[in-house]
Amino acid sequence: MKIFFAFILAFFASFHYSQAQALDETHVEPYCHIHTIPPSISSEAISSKATSSEATSSEATVLTESAASRVDSILASSPLLYKSSLGLMVYDLTDNKTIISYGEKNTLRPASTMKLVTAIAAIDRLGGSYLFRTSLRYTGEIKDNVLNGDVYCIGGFDPRFNSDDLTAFVEGIRSLGIDTIRGCLVADKMMKNEDRLGWGWCWDDDNPVLSPLLISRKDEFMQHFVSELVDAGIVFIGNIIEGDTPIDAYEIVDRTHTIDQILMKMMKDSDNLYAEALFYQLASSSGNRPATAQDARNIIKRLIRKIGLNPSDYIFADGSGLSLYNYVTAELEVEMLKYAYQNSNIYLHLYPSLPIAGIDGTLKRRMKTPFTTDNVRAKTGTLTGVQSLAGYCTTPNNHTLCFAIINNGILKDSQARSLQDKICEALCSP
């Protein structure tokens, strides 16, 4: 028995940017299953020596084909198939094979599923024990409770740094017996360059602050620091400046947060500031000071090449997916998810950070059905005209799938989300 299902759609798009590279004309490929439905097997043909593993494999194939057939029907009935650009790919990580693909090589804007690329590249490069660090140092001499020297606040682009951390900074100064500072308070922002907006961001959007020295998400660190010093009774006589910290500066205190703490907020809540902070940690790992977005892009491109794809086929503009210049494919996102799954040092940190269908994050109110709730774990993406979803789910026969669904040119977000939810339901149902 065979299922014949074919659509030939052609979408041509020419993308022109004032600063971006031109993309080739994109063709939407006809829908294609990469699967074969097994023919009916008579009882006479069944060998008495058939093993249980063969039976299990047969059952798994039937379940896979059933899911693919359901996705066929969903796509056939969706107006988005011919009214928008779609990229879809589903890969069986247990059987190591692609089971569904449609337009998987179409170059599309990913929106916040770009955060998956950032997260996987960062964990791969930095490691699961990596710490976001903001440091306090000083130079000069302490005599009679007076510091005749400078205090340096070294920014590490930690989006979680808050008033409690700042209080710890002030307590660190008090612990040295200092009640007066005669010198400068220096804001060391040398971790990254001075870019305030990401490449391809709209200036009038509610964009995250790209400063390596933040307090409660705002670029007001030094003002708050001086206020805390005054409240603690520490006299400051000097100027507030920006500069680089000398290598011989003395340590006062460090405040750190783990990469897991960053990932949880970044992925569950789709927090753009956290994503850009991680993007610049990646950039900083290049050793360049100040680091740039291009440093991060170069590291991501090396990983793309490592997993067997051509990085020149994509554009990586930022870490969050806010940029209108990001262009990836469903195939790329699936390959990244595969790479993460196959490397436990990445997967153990990525998987817990993903929103859980019907439970938390951006999927809390979605897919509240018996087969998808607490099963689908995926990153959502939303921009004007863009809806995307990429992540993992488990089939009734305990196969782990990874998938990516990217939809561009949509007029109604609810319509695209409904399509995503139905596809996930089809993958998770018996």
Task: State each model region's role.
Residues 96, 110-128, 185, 224-228, ...:
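Active-site SXXK
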Residues 23-44, 58-107, 171-176, 429:
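Beta-lactamase-like hydrolase cores
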